[in-house]
Amino acid sequence: MTNYRERLWPAPWLFIATALVIPASLLVFVPIDVVVGAVVAVILYAGCCVGLLLASPVVEVTDRELVAGKARLPRAFIGEAHAFSGDEAVLERGQRLDARAWLLLRGWVQPVVRVEVLDADDPTPYWLISTRNPSALVEALGSARG
């Protein structure tokens, strides 16, 4: 059973910023042909947008595991979970970050949750996961730990 599920969709401003491929491709292809330039611009922009959407990872907590992107952490190895937002989230991503930590960070999602890893054979001390709803993720992780 799924206790929590979130897809880390790109922020709207990212699609606006990606629109800069339109004038860039027009600049390159209009000297060849205006129609070719317009078609290439639209195709490149659409391709970039589809790429952003397809690359959006999923964070999911089930009765069996925590899934963050392509990584999976079995329920038995889920330790304490702590939510951070604002300046605390910035510190967790920067000055407090352990180089051995496993990261699923997205620049357009500020809050993060740190999940301790209890597996003695795993050199990763914790996972740091971007989430738009840190309290719900921490609550789901608490119920997953049992």
Language model feature labels by segment:
Residues 69-128:
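Non-transmembrane, membrane-adjacent beta-strand/coil modules in membrane-associated proteins
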